[in-house]
């Protein structure tokens, strides 16, 4: 019995997720998508994009049974930590095109999913974004844009009003919708840049502000093909913001 118990315990340790294991799995998925994106195999591009997308979104988005890095961070936030202050990113970068470099934890989720909503629906499919006045009220958001240009006091104030359960509902809606969009893409779309008028819709609909620390996003996105958007911001952008949360908070895996 002792040997059996030890064996079972050892197996649990071997299969238990750690931050390092999760980061390695995600890194491998990113590499697989990057390699596929260089080619013309449409189904492989979409599959690797969806695999990568699944790993950096809550498990409910893709229907996977195992918790993802997004689940671990969100679950921590949902236990009264939405206003924990964390770095905006974990690498050395010039933030002259940004507001505060320290933000409430909930800002990271707002920022990444507002951007995913705008890019996937308006730029990748010329459709209608999910966010509207009803979602704004449910989430308790004081803004409609991505929050790029918020100063520290503004970001702190923003975080205090956020309804975490409804923010999660918005995240799930955005993530599931993005997967449908990815499944419907053609190779021609993936290899093509989008019209300028689509890009300008984001400003017209309040997705960015006229502050240069916000509006520069339009220039950046306008230079990307749809395939490029599948990386930044649909997948890799999430890891850019989940990583500082994991590295600077006592989140258990």
Q: Could you say what each language-model-derived stretch is?
A:
Residues 1-7:
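N-terminal export/membrane-targeting signals
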Residues 109:
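Conserved H-X4-D acyltransferase segment
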Residues 6, 13-106, 115-253:
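Aromatic-glycine hotspot motif
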């Amino acid at each position: 019995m002792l040997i059996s118990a030890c064996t079972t315990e050892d197996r649990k340790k071997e299969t238990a997720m750690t931050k390092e294991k999760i980061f390695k799995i995600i890194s491998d998925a990113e590499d697989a998508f990057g390699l596929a994106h260089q080619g013309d195999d449409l189904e492989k591009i979409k599959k690797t994009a969806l695999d990568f997308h699944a790993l950096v979104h809550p498990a409910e988005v893709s229907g996977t049974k195992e918790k993802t890095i997004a689940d671990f961070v969100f679950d921590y936030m949902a236990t009264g930590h939405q206003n924990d202050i964390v770095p905006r990113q974990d690498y050395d970068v010039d933030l002259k095109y940004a507001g505060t470099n320290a933000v409430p934890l909930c800002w990271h989720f707002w920022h990444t999913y507002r951007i995913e909503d705008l890019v996937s629906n308006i730029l990748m499919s010329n459709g209608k974004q999910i966010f509207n006045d009803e979602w704004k009220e449910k989430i308790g958001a004081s803004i409609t844009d991505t929050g790029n240009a918020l100063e520290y006091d503004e970001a702190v104030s923003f975080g205090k009003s956020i309804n975490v359960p409804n923010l999660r509902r918005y995240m799930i809606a955005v993530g599931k919708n993005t997967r449908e969009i990815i499944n419907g893409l053609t190779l021609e779309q993936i290899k093509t840049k989008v019209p300028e008028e689509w890009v300008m819709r984001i400003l017209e609909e309040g997705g960015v502000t006229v502050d240069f620390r916000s509006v520069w996003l339009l220039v950046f996105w306008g230079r990307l093909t749809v395939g490029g958007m599948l990386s930044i911001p649909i997948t890799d952008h999430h890891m850019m913001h989940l990583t500082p949360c994991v590295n600077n908070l006592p989140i258990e895996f």
